[in-house]
């Protein structure tokens, strides 16, 4: 691996499999992180990305605040983080924390830092990756399982306060928060155990069904509610936008529970309830399915797992074809009925008789879903009622227009909120939290 020491987030890192690949890869690393020192590392395959959270003061004290697992990555950038680490043996994990503390002391580090490792499940061994000299965006994972406010600790450390006088760290070691007696931070047994398990998911403006290709554009709506088990934040809001030069991540969700499986379930619920509508695509549906896979639940994935799934073109499940067709026909027909109504009223406002060709009661919607063409006859049977006909079969639905431009469609006793977004390749439908595309018939 060729890696720029100033790089991060997937930038400034390349894998080379032969000497012939080195010159070109080296130039790419140089171009992505200009001026950075570049070093070569042995490639560790089938590894987990584990990291230890550190706090170090001005007096030579270093405390490790548990560990995190950040192995679910695409293009070397984290997508899912969790803590504490569950895949490594406790003795090995304790040794990793000890080495991390020793490293920080050896360079007289002060502040919050993360020491990152590549861990081999087969060998129960690990390799040093890097010391990240900053507070990382996934720090709430550690805060939730430890009760330690890491940014607040940074402020106190900068003021010269020793670690053993910081109330949160004293609580972590079972001490009186108001006390000042010394603490042996090398004695891991004195530290309270982690409080439950936390799963974190980065929300990115990427099309997960197209190799996590970045997307940009306006955001009409972001709907997410925090609760005692789930917390999240977003760097933009409805009415804002993600531009093409920004980092793809614009949100982060965290779910906590007593066990790892319960935390996964809490995150699944949170992702299903998350609603993001606009020109961008997001990874939320994809990750929701990803964390329910056998490999993730079984804790047997590695850092190359997600990239392999992308290469194998594993995509998210789409809405049932019949629901996509019905909702697609409803969206297309309501658009045409509204256009005809405007045209009809235009004639009346001019004192003219509207021509007979303007029908506000029937139309035909034709589109392609999953490479299949559908031609649906639509008849308006009431102010909010449509009858759809396809291949001799018919279905009645109730359609109500929403204030935000969406439709509330009632079908067979179930309600579906549907929004649409026009794109160069067709119409993107958001049915609840699932997405499908309506394409025009391809030219021969």
Segment roles from a protein language model:
Residues 13-14, 42, 88, 249-258:
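Short, well-ordered beta-strand elements within core beta-sheets of diverse protein domains
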Residues 140-389, 393-396:
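Catalytic cores of soluble metabolic enzymes centered on carboxylation/carboxyl-transfer
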């Amino acid at each position: 691996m060729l890696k720029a020491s100033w790089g991060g987030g997937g930038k400034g890192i390349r894998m080379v499999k032969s000497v012939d690949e080195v010159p070109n890869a080296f130039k790419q690393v140089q171009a992505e992180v200009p001026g950075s020192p570049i070093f070569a590392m042995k490639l560790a395959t089938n590894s987990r990305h584990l990291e230890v959270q550190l706090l170090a003061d001005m007096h030579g004290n270093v405390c490790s605040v548990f560990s995190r697992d950040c192995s679910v990555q695409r293009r070397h950038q984290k997508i899912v983080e969790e803590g504490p680490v569950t895949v490594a043996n406790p003795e090995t994990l304790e040794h990793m924390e000890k080495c991390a503390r020793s490293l920080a002391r050896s360079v007289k580090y002060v502040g919050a830092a993360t020491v990152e490792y590549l861990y081999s499940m087969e060998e129960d061994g690990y390799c040093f990756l890097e010391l990240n000299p900053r507070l990382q965006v996934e720090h709430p994972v550690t805060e939730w399982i430890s009760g330690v406010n890491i940014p607040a600790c940074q402020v106190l450390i900068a003021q010269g306060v020793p670690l053993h006088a910081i109330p949160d760290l004293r609580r972590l070691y079972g001490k009186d928060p108001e006390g000042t007696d010394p603490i042996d931070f090398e004695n891991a047994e004195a530290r309270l155990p982690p409080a439950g398990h936390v799963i974190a998911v980065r929300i990115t403006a990427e099309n997960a069904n197209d190799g996590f290709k970045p997307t940009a554009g306006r955001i009409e709506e972001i709907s997410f509610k925090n609760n005692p088990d789930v917390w999240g934040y977003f760097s933009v809001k409805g009415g804002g936008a993600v531009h093409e030069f920004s980092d793809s991540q614009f949100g982060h969700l965290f779910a906590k529970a007593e066990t790892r499986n319960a935390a996964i379930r809490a995150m699944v619920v949170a992702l299903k309830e998350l609603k993001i509508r606009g020109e961008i695509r997001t990874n939320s549906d994809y990750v929701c399915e990803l964390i329910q896979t056998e490999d993730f639940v079984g804790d047997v994935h590695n850092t190359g797992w997600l990239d392999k799934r992308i290469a194998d073109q594993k995509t998210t499940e789409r809405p049932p074809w019949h629901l996509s067709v019905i909702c697609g026909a409803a969206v297309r027909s309501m658009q045409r009925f509204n256009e005809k109504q405007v045209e009809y009223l235009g004639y009346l406002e001019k004192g003219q008789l509207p021509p007979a060709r303007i029908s506000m009661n029937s139309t035909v919607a034709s589109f392609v879903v999953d490479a299949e063409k559908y031609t649906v006859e639509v008849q308006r049977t009431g102010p909010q009622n449509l009858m759809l006909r396809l291949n001799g079969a018919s279905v009645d639905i109730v359609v109500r227009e929403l204030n935000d431009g969406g439709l509330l469609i009632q079908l067979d006793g179930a309600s579906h909120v549907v929004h649409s977004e026009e794109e160069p390749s067709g119409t993107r439908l958001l049915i609840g939290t699932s997405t499908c595309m309506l394409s025009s018939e391809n030219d021969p």
